[in-house]
Structures are given as C-alpha cells and as structure tokens.
C-alpha cells in the first residue's frame, strides 16, 4: 500500500463532531460525486477506488440523513483493473446537496466553499480532510521530491481550497492541469503541518521519521562529497608540485632555486605524502605556516612554467 493510501485509510477511521461530518461529506460529494436522472428521479453517484473512503461516505450519509444508500462494486477493464466503488444515493438527493451547500435552492451549482460549512476551525480542518480524501495525493517521503496536492475540476473551488489551506499558513500554491486545477505543497515542513491539520498523525510521524533519516543521509553524502573533492584537490596540487619540482631538477637542477625554495622543493620531493602543515614543521630555522609553505610552492610552480616557456631563470 502506498504512503498516500495508508494516509487516507488512517483518515477514514477518525471520529468527528456532527458539524465536521457535514463539512467533510460536502467536500467528498462535491469532488467525487456525479448527478444522473433516471425515471424522473435524481440520483448521486460518488465514485472512488478506495474501499475505506467508500465506507466512510456510506456511513456519513446514513448517519447524517438516515437515507437508503447503495454500495456498488465494479471492476475497471483498463490499466490496473482495480475495483471501483460507487456509493449511490437516490433518496433526498436535492435536499442533501442543498444542505451540504453544493447547490442553491434553484439547483444552480455553488463553485466555491460556503462559509456556513467552515465557520469553525474544526470544520475547516474537516473540509480539507474531505478534499484530500476525494482528490488528494502525497508522495512517499523516500522519493526524490516532497509533494502533496489536491485536485479539483473547477478553478473557483481550487482557489477556495488554496485560500483555506493558507489560512493555516501553509504557503500552498495553485497550478492549472490538463483536466482541472491543483493546490499543492512542496516544502516538507508544510506537508507535515497539513497532515497534522487533517488529523493524519500516524502518517505525519512516519513522514517525519523517513524525512529525518533521508536528510541525515543527504547531509552525510554532501559532507563525504565535499571532503572527497577537497582531497582530490589536495592530491592534484601535490602531484602538480612534485611534477614541477622534478622538471626543474631535470632541466636546470634544484641549485638554481633560492635557498628557501630549494629546501621546500627537496622536502616536497622526498616526502610526497605529508601535508603542508607537516612540511612547515620539517623546515630548518623554525616552523612555517601552511600559507607560508603554499606561497613558496607557488613560486616553484611559477619557475617551472617559465622554464617550460623557454625563459631563462637565473639563480638568486
């Protein structure tokens, strides 16, 4: 089971107050429901591939409105061939849609979220929970990028979801997709805050555990890469210095170098594996800093380059 499916399964087991049940059910019906007329009767089909969500909708309708609800199961014939669960409501369809603030009295569709549904903070959380159950997804935190989104067919409703989320300081953003719109989060901290808001506490803890391990692993990898790069740079510099010293020795001899440079050249040639700090401790006449050793080695590099260019280097 995917991380998103586990999160939704957890959410379907939450208990709520009556006002919150109404807010969650409104989001579920608005986003997953479709209307049809048969034998002069209006019916509502709420379709999902998640059995736990279908049971949740069925229970909320029975509990909230005491109506007869049908639960149908069909097999998809394409792609994964998953089961499709259809919760069908025939009784009081118009009244329930109006009570959930999905349609007006004249049966015109309400595209945004009614403020009457979300007056209380707990109801705001519940509406977001219903929206996530109906059209939400969240990446497994072990994957390369953090991403949570809620899909909606209508721009007005999508903008309302974004506004509702940002009322909790989530910094969510919207994006148009080919068949609708999404409100999404990309920051790991904001995703965990959203999971907390909708009541997915177990999913939150799992997300955080995985994220901490992943971030620690990334930090270690960055540190190792940095140290490896520095080591490669140091080795490269040492090899260049040794090659230049050998070139000077074979071309004109190290005696052409000033005394201080000649001593460093001989030490670098004879002790190729030691660090600059260790070289500085080996010179005669007292300890020299790393920067001092580096300065002398650069002077040796310059002399080698002049010799390669055919210039004459006089002994100083």
Curated annotation (Swiss-Prot):
Keyword Transport: no
Functional summary from the UniProt entry: Involved in cell division and chromosome segregation.
UniProt xrefs under NCBIfam families: DNA_bind_WhiA
Entry keywords, A to Z: Cell cycle, Cell division, DNA-binding
Protein name (Swiss-Prot/TrEMBL): Probable cell division protein WhiA
GO MF annotations in UniProt: DNA binding
UniProt family annotation: Belongs to the WhiA family.
Gene3D superfamilies in alphabetical order: Homing endonucleases
GO biological process annotation, one example: regulation of sporulation
Species: Bacillus cereus (strain G9842)
DNA-binding segment(s): 275-309
InterPro entries per record: Homing_endonucl, Sporu_reg_WhiA_N_dom, Sporulation_regulator_WhiA, Sporulation_regulator_WhiA_C, WhiA_LAGLIDADG_dom
Keyword Cell division found: yes
One Pfam family hit: WhiA_N
């Amino acid at each position: 089971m995917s991380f998103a499916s586990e999160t939704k399964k957890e959410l379907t087991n939450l208990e709520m107050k009556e006002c919150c049940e109404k807010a969650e059910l409104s989001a579920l019906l608005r986003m997953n429901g479709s209307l049809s007329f048969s034998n002069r009767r209006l019916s509502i089909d709420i379709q999902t591939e998640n059995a736990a969500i279908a049971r949740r909708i069925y229970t909320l309708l029975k509990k909230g409105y005491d109506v007869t609800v049908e639960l149908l199961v069909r097999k998809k014939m394409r792609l994964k061939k998953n089961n499709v669960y259809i919760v069908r409501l025939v009784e009081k369809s118009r009244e329930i849609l109006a009570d959930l603030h999905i349609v007006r009295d004249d049966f015109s569709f309400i595209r945004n979220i009614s403020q009457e549904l979300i007056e209380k903070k707990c109801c705001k959380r519940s509406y977001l929970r219903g929206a996530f159950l109906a059209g939400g997804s969240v990446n497994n935190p072990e994957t390369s990028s953090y991403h949570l989104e809620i899909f909606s067919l209508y721009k007005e409703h999508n903008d309302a979801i974004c506004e509702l989320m940002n009322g909790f300081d989530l910094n969510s953003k919207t994006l148009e997709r080919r068949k609708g719109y999404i409100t999404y989060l990309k920051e790991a901290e904001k995703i965990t805050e959203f999971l907390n808001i909708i009541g997915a506490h177990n999913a939150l803890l799992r997300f955080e555990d995985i994220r901490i391990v992943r971030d620690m692993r990334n930090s270690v990898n960055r540190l190792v890469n940095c140290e490896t790069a520095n080591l490669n740079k140091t080795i490269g510099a040492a090899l260049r210095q040794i090659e230049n010293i050998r070139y000077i020795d074979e071309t004109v001899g190290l005696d052409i170098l000033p005394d201080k440079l000649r001593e460093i050249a001989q030490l670098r040639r004879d002790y190729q594996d030691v660090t600059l700090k260790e070289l500085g401790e080996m010179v005669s006449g007292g300890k020299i800093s790393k920067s001092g050793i580096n300065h002398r080695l650069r002077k040796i590099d310059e002399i080698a380059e002049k010799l390669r260019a055919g210039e004459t280097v006089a002994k100083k």
